[in-house]
């Protein structure tokens, strides 16, 4: 039985791109981590988020991060890497590598970043099969099986709610509606949906950079910052490298 969301504590998740960034997150008091397909593609392979990483690539990063952190880790499993049988295997391997939860999405298997155009999604029946396959592989009631849906951009709010209800019935115990554009839509979702809802707050994405308070008031209980720290690290590194390139390194200002 799910407690009403207004009593839930807000959970902030930071994307760990490697064990070092996971240590930084813990130092600041962040209570939960996230490993994303985009993060593995960007940071471990220097590639864009276009379904170019394999299950083994993500498991490798998960094991490294789990090796130095005891924080809960939610892992992006994209479309599950294959058929129902594969999804069951994916889920079991994620659990044994130390994941505290996973999310699986309803895009077609040649997926794209959720904030880019031309996304294609599968039928709700096919997605329910994905969720059931994952659910059957899970024995721990506390394990988070989150359904990510990209339906909002393709089909609008009502169809997103319909899909979400089916996904929960199939065994999802949390919802990740991607690329939602207004607080009103989050509120409408949270009023209809019985499980925790995640908001993906990524700079330069389709979702405005709403505050924690705004999202909490709209019924969101998990806020994900998938790229904020990575973008800041990248910008700082670029600035330092540029300075080194154009001036004597000894004259750098301390950072």
Regions found by a protein language model. Give the residues of each.
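Proline-centered helix-kink/hinge sites
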Residues: 72, 98, 196, 226, ...
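C-terminal alpha-helical cap/extension of soluble enzyme domains
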Residues: 77, 201-247, 251
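Single conserved hydrophobic/aromatic residue that forms the stacking wall/gate
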Residues: 1-8, 12, 244-255
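Intrinsically disordered, low-complexity regions enriched in small/polar residues
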Residues: 3-4, 36, 169, 232, ...
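Histidine (H) residue identity feature
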Residues: 1-2, 103, 115, 225, ...
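Small/polar loops that bind or transfer phosphate-bearing groups
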Residues: 3, 13-16, 177-178, 225, ...
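Alpha/beta enzyme core
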Residues: 13, 17-71, 79-195, 199, ...
């Amino acid at each position: 039985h799910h407690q009403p969301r207004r009593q839930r504590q807000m959970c902030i998740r930071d994307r760990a791109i490697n064990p070092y960034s996971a240590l930084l997150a813990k130092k600041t008091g962040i209570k939960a981590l996230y490993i994303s397909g985009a993060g593995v593609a960007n940071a471990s392979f220097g590639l864009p988020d276009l379904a170019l990483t394999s299950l083994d690539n993500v498991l490798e990063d998960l094991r490294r991060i789990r090796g130095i952190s005891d924080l809960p880790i939610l892992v992006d499993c994209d479309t599950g890497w294959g058929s129902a049988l594969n999804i069951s295997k994916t889920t079991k391997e994620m659990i044994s590598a130390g994941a505290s939860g996973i999310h699986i999405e309803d895009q077609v298997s040649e997926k794209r970043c959720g904030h880019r155009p031309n996304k294609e999604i599968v039928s709700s029946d096919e997605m329910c099969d994905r969720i059931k396959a994952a659910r059957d592989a899970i024995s721990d009631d506390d394990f988070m099986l989150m359904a990510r849906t990209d339906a909002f951009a393709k089909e609008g709010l009502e169809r997103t709610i319909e899909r979400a209800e089916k996904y929960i019935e199939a065994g999802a115990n949390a919802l990740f509606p991607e690329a939602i554009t207004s607080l009103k839509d989050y509120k409408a979702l949270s009023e209809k949906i019985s499980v925790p809802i995640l908001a993906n707050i990524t700079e330069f994405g389709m979702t405005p950079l709403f505050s924690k308070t705004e999202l909490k008031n709209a019924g969101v209980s998990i806020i994900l910052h998938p790229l904020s720290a990575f973008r800041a690290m990248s910008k700082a590194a670029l600035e330092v490298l540029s300075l080194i390139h154009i001036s004597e390194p000894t004259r750098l200002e301390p950072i």
